[in-house]
A protein has these predicted regions:
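Extended assembly-interface regions of large multimeric machines
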Residues: 1-147, 155-192, 309-345, 353, ...
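Conserved, function-critical positions that sit in or immediately flank catalytic
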Residues: 161-461
Length: 461
C-alpha cells in the first residue's frame, strides 16, 4: 500500500523533541568517548581515524558497547537547543528555485513538476536564502530561471523585487546569539515566531505559464477573475500570436487551495496551461518552521576546559553520544548533575610512577586489564576504561575483570607501578542506563587544558 510520512508529522516530531529538553520528565546528556584509535583491529567495520566507521544500530552497539569507552557527559539545557534548517547562503550568479506549493505533483502533460534544481519536493529545492547580514528570504519568483545577481536586503512585510528581476519575501533575521550558538556550516536557526501578521492564507503571489495554447484572440485582458475556492484574485493575461504570452497577478486574493481562469475570459485560448502558485496556510512568514521545513533539531554544547575536573584534557575523543535519562550511580536515580564522569578510577598510595594516557594497565593478581585515560599526580588518581577488547579491557581469558585490592598495577608503556588504596569501578554515569538516541563517529578531536570544544549535533526527523 503506497504511503508517506508527511512533512507535518516530521515537523511535529522535531518540535516535540525540542520541547522535551525543557520538560521535567526527561534529561539529556551529550557524552564524548572513544579515546582509542579506530584502527585497532578489534572488530569488523572498524574504520580508521581518517575514515571513521558508520555506527551500527543494533542491540550490542547501542545498548551495551557504546558505554564502554565513554569519558564524560554534560547535561544539555533547553536553551542549548533549537529547530534548524539547511543553511543556504545567497551567492551572486546562482539560479535559485522559487516557492511552489505543488512540487512533485503531476501536471496536465503527465510530467512531474520539478524545480529548476530538479527537486521534486519543496524542501529539497533552493527556494530560500540567508544574506550576508543573516536575514532570511523566500524566493517568490526567479525571473524565468535566471541567475540572481542582486542580494535581497529589504526587511519589509510586502513582497519586493530586486534589480535582477527576482521577487523575495522577508522571513526573519538571526540575532547575534543565534548566529553564535545555532549557525554552522550546513545548518541555521529557524524562527518559531511569525514575522508577518499581515499576510493571509491562500493568496496567489506567483503564476507560471507552462503552455500558451492556441487559437485565442490577441489582446490584453485585465481584471480577469481567478476562479477556485478562494476569493478576490485578479490577474492580467496577455494573448499574443493567438497564445497566452504572460500572466500578471494584480490582486492576490485569499483562501485559495486551487485556482484557474476561464478560457472565455482570456480570448478563448485553447489548450493553455496556467499554474497559479498558492501561498502556504496562513500566508508566507506566518509559520516559518513549517514553510521552510524545520524538521531538524540542533543541540549546541560547549566543553569548557576540564568542566571542574569531570572532563579530561590529556586525551582525544572520536565519538559523541546523545543519551536520554541516564542513571546517576551515586543517587541511583535519573541523572540531573551538570556533568558526569563516565570512567573508572584507582587512587594509589606512596609514590607511584607516572602513568601515561592510552597505555594498557594490568594487575597481575586479578588479571584485570584497563586503558588509561589520564593520571593526576597530585591526587595520585588514575582514570581508565575497560572496553570489551583485548589489551584494553579484556584479560587473557577473554573476561572483563575488575581491578581490586592492593596488588600492584603496572603500566605497559610507562612501566609505572602503583599500589592501590581505593577503587571506584562504578562510573557516575551508570553504564547501560538510559536511551542512546544518537551516535556519531568523528575524526580525533584533541583537547587542551585551555581549550573549549563546541559540539553541534543535528537530529533529522
Amino acid at each position: 500500500m503506497p504511503a508517506i510520512i508527511t512533512k507535518d508529522f516530521r515537523i511535529h516530531n522535531a518540535r516535540q523533541f525540542q520541547e522535551s529538553f525543557s520538560e521535567a520528565a526527561d534529561t539529556y546528556y551529550l557524552a564524548i568517548g572513544r579515546p582509542q584509535a579506530f584502527a585497532d583491529n578489534q572488530a569488523f567495520n572498524d574504520g580508521t581515524d581518517t575514515s571513521p566507521p558508520t555506527p551500527v544500530d543494533d542491540v550490542g552497539q547501542v545498548e551495551y558497547y557504546a558505554y564502554d569507552d565513554l569519558l564524560s557527559a554534560k547535561k544539555i539545557a533547553s536553551s542549548d537547543t533549537t529547530l534548524v534548517i539547511p543553511r543556504r547562503d545567497w551567492a551572486t550568479g546562482t539560479t535559485y528555485d522559487y516557492y511552489r506549493h505543488d512540487y512533485g505533483d503531476i501536471n496536465t502533460a503527465g510530467a512531474t513538476i520539478t524545480s529548476n534544481s530538479n527537486a521534486t519536493n519543496l524542501y529539497d529545492s533552493t527556494f530560500y536564502v540567508v544574506n550576508s547580514s543573516y536575514d532570511v528570504f523566500v524566493c517568490i519568483d526567479n525571473d524565468g530561471d535566471t541567475a540572481s545577481t542582486t542580494e535581497p536586503t529589504t526587511k519589509q512585510a510586502a513582497i519586493f523585487s530586486t534589480a535582477d528581476g527576482y521577487k523575495w519575501k522577508y522571513m526573519y533575521s538571526l540575532a547575534s546569539a543565534e548566529q553564535a550558538n545555532f549557525l554552522s556550516t550546513d545548518f541555521m536557526h529557524v524562527s518559531t515566531e511569525s514575522t508577518d501578521y499581515s499576510t493571509v492564507g491562500g493568496a496567489i503571489e506567483n503564476v507560471k505559464v507552462t503552455a500558451g495554447g492556441a487559437s485565442g484572440t490577441n489582446g490584453s485582458y485585465t481584471s480577469v477573475v481567478i476562479r477556485g475556492d478562494g476569493t478576490g484574485g485578479r490577474c492580467t493575461v496577455v494573448v499574443g500570436a493567438n497564445a497566452v504570452s504572460s500572466v500578471t497577478i494584480t490582486t492576490a486574493g485569499t483562501g485559495y487551495t486551487f485556482a484557474s481562469v476561464l478560457a472565455s475570459d482570456i480570448g478563448s485560448v485553447v489548450g493553455a496551461d496556467i499554474d497559479f502558485i498558492i501561498s502556504p496556510p496562513g500566508g508566507h512568514a506566518t509559520d516559518v518552521v513549517a514553510e521552510l521545513g524545520g524538521f531538524y533539531v540542533m543541540t549546541n554544547t560547549n566543553f569548557t576546559q576540564t568542566e571542574s575536573g569531570e572532563f579530561n584534557t590529556d586525551n582525544d575523543f572520536r565519538r559523541v553520544v546523545l543519551i536520554r535519562n541516564p542513571i546517576d550511580s551515586d543517587s541511583a536515580a535519573t541523572a540531573t548533575e551538570s556533568t558526569l564522569d563516565c570512567t573508572k578510577s584507582i587512587v594509589f598510595s606512596g609514590s607511584p610512577g607516572t602513568f601515561v594516557a592510552d597505555e594498557k594497565i594490568t594487575q597481575s593478581s586479578s588479571g584485570a586489564v584497563g586503558y588509561v585515560i589520564d593520571y593526576t599526580s597530585g591526587t595520585k588518581t588514575l582514570r581508565y576504561i575497560q572496553p570489551q577488547f583485548a589489551n584494553q579491557g579484556i584479560d587473557s581469558n577473554g573476561t572483563l575483570t575488575a581491578f581490586t585490592g592492593t596488588d600492584t598495577v603496572t603500566g605497559a608503556t610507562s612501566s609505572a607501578t602503583g599500589t592501590p588504596t581505593t577503587h571506584d569501578t562504578t562510573p557516575e554515569l551508570q553504564h547501560d542506563s538510559g536511551d542512546i538516541l544518537y551516535i556519531e563517529n568523528r575524526k580525533p578531536v584533541t583537547r587542551a587544558s585551555d581549550q573549549t570544544e563546541n559540539v553541534k549535533l543535528i537530529v533529522e526527523f
